[in-house]
Amino acid sequence: MKQMSSAQVRQMWLDFWATKGHAVEPSVSLVPVNDPTLLWINSGVATLKKYFDGTIIPENPRITNAQKAIRTNDIENVGKTARHHTMFEMLGNFSIGDYFRDEAIEWAYELLTSPEWFDFPKDKLYMTYYPDDKDSYNRWIAMGVEPSHLIPIEDNFWEIGAGPSGPDTEIFFDRGEAFDPENIGVRLLEEDIENDRYIEIWNIVLSQFNADPAVPRSEYKELPHKNIDTGAGLERLVAVIQGAKTNFETDLFMPIIREVEKLSGKVYDQDGDNMSFKVIADHIRSLSFAIGDGALPGNEGRGYVLRRLLRRASMHGQKLGINEPFLYKLVPTVGKIMESYYPEVLEKQEFIEKIIKSEEESFARTLHSGQHFAETIVADLKAKGQTVISGQDAFKLYDTYGFPLELTEEIAEEADMTVDRAGFEAAMKEQQDRARASVVKGGSMGMQNETLQAITVESAFNYEKEELTAELLAIVADDAAVESVETGTAALIFAETPFYAEMGGQVADHGQIFDGAGNLVAQVTDVQKAPNGQPLHTVEVLAPLALGQSYKLEIDHSRRHRVMKNHTATHLLHAALHNVLGNHATQAGSLNEVEFLRFDFTHFQAVTAEELRAIEQEVNEKIWEALAIETVETDIDTAKEMGAMALFGEKYGKEVRVVTIGDYSVELCGGTHVGNTSEIGIFKIVKEEGIGSGTRRILAVTSKEAFEAYREEEEALKAIAATLKAPQIKEVPHKVEALQEQLRQLQKENAELKEKAAAAASGEVFKDVQEANGHSFIASQVSVSDAGALRTFADTWKQKDYSDVLVLVAAIGDKVNVLAASKTKDVHAGNLIKELAPIVDGRGGGKPDMAMAGGSKQSAIPDLLAAVAEKL
């Protein structure tokens, strides 16, 4: 077996499949593009779904890739096992309706065992297969594999919901008896026993059925085009090739671990407790790549996952004695390890470091808040005479504040308490189940559409014309290919078309179709790309249409031009975002509609009013400069040399279209654009908002819609000016400021009057002092207009020695407001209010010296006042 670096293993994989006629697909962003079903790209095949379900037919049906992926449904196992990771690389080879079982097995065996390639010892390889899949068994036998090395496993059938499915055959590497202390042997495979001896290195899925959850597996229909989908984990392959005990002792992780050793002063013990080193090494890879791809830490979705990973790694850093932000210092090491295939980490190093360091500092503050929350829990339990921190509270400390269970148990032990570990684990399992359920939701591929896949006629989109005459080549009606259609809805393909198919965020053209006599025969309501790439026109048929006939196709010119203005403005906006916010503000999605444009981009905070003003100003200046728009078709390498901005994660063919706006913007784009920026007229941002962790959205309008938006604002300002009796709009701010000052003065006078009234009333309230359990207290109902007046009463009470405890109740509207205050350490106002509030169907809490509660049962106010003595 050859000794190789991880970079050499990856490259050998790609080189081998290239010799078998496979196109090498580049790794795409971890953040899925145009796939809302996935939180992350979680496999090599996730980026190829449209090929497998037949939505798109690839140029080359043979594909190979090395794809970075993230799976986080088993975060807690990372660091505990030899092979669990959050981020990993999946090596794959795929056949879309081309070769099948025989070639897949033959070539896999060749790559693994040939001296020219990996040169694995043949006697170290074991294969599992689906019991009913005799063809795979026979093919392995034909390759020379011993029958004793072929294990039938009932679970070797791949399916996730509806769509492509089929048996799979897995390849394992036997690391020997040293990893099998009980000498169980091949039974470890037969009985699916977790072990470190037989390492799964490759799974070959033979996708030959359209799975249908409504019928038994035996009734699944054969796919019209059978596929091969395989996955081999790079980390596992490298561990086997480098003879590492675990994946972490390979060149993919050890440089990171060495850096952690330097930062901590601790030494990684291969055979000892090294979990913290492993967690940090794994999680910093995920953080570096995910943030580099535009995901940012937050409270939901991808952001929540990243925040969890960072906090877990940070806590493990503390276990190693690192008590300051340190994870950001590991980013350069991650970048250097991966730069041969993934240069983006080093390219975005400064930004990634900034985000991670900021999040580490924020977590330090959160930990402090968590410490306060933990102290409150302990104090409340002591006050109630209880000694067990609930599983829910322990989980909240873990989930919200990042406290590992062990830290909560230490806090409990110091207070002579324990933690409900079973309750914590139950809450944890609920969360894990939710995570796993979300993973399954996104796994299914759609059913293959045989009719559309079978249409292979050539059709071209003409950028230069808005109307032309072309032959009708295909008609699909009621999911069948037909020669003619007379009424209803149909899908049409022409030899050539001026209609733009929806793509790249630009909506489709609408328009009309005429026959040779000039009669209107169909209305075009949508245009999409067919599986083989042809523009597919959805039409409402108004008169008979037949194959082989020529028709005049004419787009809605006004609609097209309005969309073009918005699309060109989107390019200007993208460039302005880079200039104002930074290069990290890259496109995360866009929509170029008729009446507006919507642009999603990565950014770690809300865009300020000043920044929005600068962005809007810059876009308009480029419009007024009347910059010419030029388009050129070239190869991808030339486009990159031109400085074209490609959307990370998008797939581009050999030939690409470059759209240049003066010397201001250069982007790869297949959409339609105006000839000069002056045609846009004017650009206006109407809204900026967050749509998810680390992702912002700008809604903007151009031309007529922008003018109308400005007019609406002007009319609103005129109305305000009239109300304020301002002669001119520009005087409105001054008038508003004057009103605000008047309001502040009135509020001040009102507050002073309330204080005087409270002081006068308090003289009566504070006279009624009672005794209970050695404490003096006042419990009274007062008449006030708001809860703030209760605090005024309390402030007056604090200034003199009226009593040890004060409880005030007020009926305000249909609600009940309660205040408790204490001057003695023996009575905790927050705990007292928690016991009193339920009497009026309320709840509340607060500090030891003052607390508030709200309730709704006014009839129970006398009961609450009567209960004060008992609670004391």
Swiss-Prot record:
Pfam families: DHHA1, tRNA-synt_2c, tRNA_SAD. Signal peptide: none annotated. Catalyzes the attachment of alanine to tRNA(Ala) in a two-step reaction: alanine is first activated by ATP to form Ala-AMP and then transferred to the acceptor end of tRNA(Ala). Also edits incorrectly charged Ser-tRNA(Ala) and Gly-tRNA(Ala) via its editing domain. Its EC number is 6.1.1.7. The gene is alaS. It is found in: Cytoplasm. Consists of three domains; the N-terminal catalytic domain, the editing domain and the C-terminal C-Ala domain. The editing domain removes incorrectly charged amino acids, while the C-Ala domain, along with tRNA(Ala), serves as a bridge to cooperatively bring together the editing and aminoacylation centers thus stimulating deacylation of misacylated tRNAs. It catalyses: tRNA(Ala) + L-alanine + ATP = L-alanyl-tRNA(Ala) + AMP + diphosphate. Zn(2+) binds at residues 567, 571, 669, 673. It comes from the Bacteria. One of its GO terms (biological process) is alanyl-tRNA aminoacylation. GO terms for molecular function: alanine-tRNA ligase activity; aminoacyl-tRNA deacylase activity; ATP binding; catalytic activity, acting on a protein; transferase activity; tRNA binding; zinc ion binding. Keywords: Aminoacyl-tRNA synthetase, ATP-binding, Cytoplasm, Ligase, Metal-binding, Nucleotide-binding, Protein biosynthesis, RNA-binding, tRNA-binding, Zinc. Its main location: cytoplasm. Binds 1 zinc ion per subunit. GO terms for cellular component: cytosol. It comes from Streptococcus sanguinis (strain SK36). The keyword Metal-binding applies. Belongs to the class-II aminoacyl-tRNA synthetase family. This is Alanine--tRNA ligase. Its cofactor is Zn(2+). Coiled coil: none annotated.
